[in-house]
A protein has these predicted regions:
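Short, positively charged
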Residues: 1-99, 103-349
């Protein structure tokens, strides 16, 4: 389910495109142009946007919508007739474009506020395993995974009836173990076991990932996947640190017109948790120079230690504005105050 902050930024982005005279008018009633926004969602949105906790988020997102309305590479001053909100709906399949709003059936919008996450994926899908893997830690580092589990099981003691082997954990075991570990720091023994697990998972995962993209064309396609460059162009409206983010994400066709892929490297990092770093080198023909884009993948438990099988979270470490294939639709503006902060008061009236 989408968080309240996510709903606020996505709906405010759409509102900014509709050409209202002021924000107070914009939130006075549910616009007829909005599709798939329920009365319950709208009422909550209209009630909280003027609270101090959410004013900065609302104002920044609303401004992004206003800029998109006037941008030459956006709506060119024509308020849309239709804004479809995706909300919590999930598209079937893997790695769909990260779209939150669809405007007039044509303009695809991704609202990304203070997030460096590019993609959440099943490790077996991202790292191209030959088979579906239930628990990536068991696949990449079975001995280290079992050693960590044994240490945790011994510390938890008789409070929970747990099976001797980590591979035998059922859903109810995982739930109980998650609760038992929620307020507990790793002991020195468990911390050492976790470091060994992290190092081995990073090493094995990076090695398997490299083998799965043996050719230059495969590595180029993987880079496009990591950067969420797909068959249709879309816009990213959001924020990065203290600046607005207004970008057009191009397609592979557009990308190859300007850029030439050189290489993509992957390696396991000694970071205290399972991490695989990645770095792509690209030739920018327009600028007549080589450029790099960096990121990393965290292979970590979903929703708490041992709660679920690990997932792969792909992060972008290079600023969005410096990524090959991400084009500016305007000059970025500074944000006043911290995101979701209470220091800056931006009343709607």
């Amino acid at each position: 389910m989408a968080s309240l902050r996510t709903e606020i930024t996505e709906l405010a982005t759409g509102l900014g495109m509709l050409g209202y005279d002021n924000p107070a008018e914009a939130v006075s009633e549910l616009p007829p142009q909005f599709i798939d926004v329920t009365d319950r969602v709208w009422e909550q949105f209209a009630r909280v946007v003027d609270e101090s906790l959410h004013r900065v988020d609302f104002a920044g997102a609303y401004r992004n919508g206003q800029v998109f309305l006037e941008a030459d590479h956006g709506l060119r001053g024509r308020p849309p007739r239709l804004i479809e909100w995706k909300g919590s709906h999930r598209s079937p399949g893997h790695d769909q474009l990260p779209i939150d709003l669809r405007v007039d059936h044509v303009y695809l919008i991704s609202c990304k506020y203070s997030s460096k996450i590019l993609l959440n994926a099943a490790p077996s899908n991202l790292f191209a395993a030959n088979q579906d893997v239930g628990d990536w830690y068991d696949h990449a580092a079975p001995q280290e995974h079992q050693a960590l589990y044994a240490a945790v099981r011994e510390e938890v003691g008789s409070n929970i009836d747990l099976p001797p082997f980590v591979g035998d954990l059922a859903k109810h075991h995982r739930t109980e173990l998650k609760l038992a570990l929620a307020d507990r720091q790793w002991s020195p023994t468990c911390a050492a076991a976790y470091r060994e697990l992290a190092a081995e998972v990073g090493r094995v995962t990076a090695s398997q990932w490299r083998k799965s993209v043996a050719t230059k064309r495969q590595r180029e396609a993987l880079l496009w996947r990591l950067l969420r460059i797909g068959p249709a162009p879309y816009y990213v409206l959001g924020s990065a640190r203290d600046r607005s983010l207004r970008l057009l994400v191009t397609t592979p066709w557009d990308w190859r017109r300007r850029f030439e892929f050189r290489d993509l490297e992957m390696w396991g990092e000694a970071a205290g948790q399972p991490i695989v770093g990645w770095k792509a080198t690209v030739r920018d023909h327009e600028a007549a120079e080589e450029t790099c884009v960096d990121g990393h993948v965290e292979v970590r438990w979903s929703h708490g230690r041992f709660a679920q099988a690990p997932e792969a979270k792909v992060y972008l470490d290079t600023p969005h504005t410096q990524v090959p294939g991400y084009l500016h639709i305007d000059d970025a503006e500074r944000w006043a105050g911290r995101i979701s902060g209470t220091e800056i008061q931006l009343p709607l009236s």
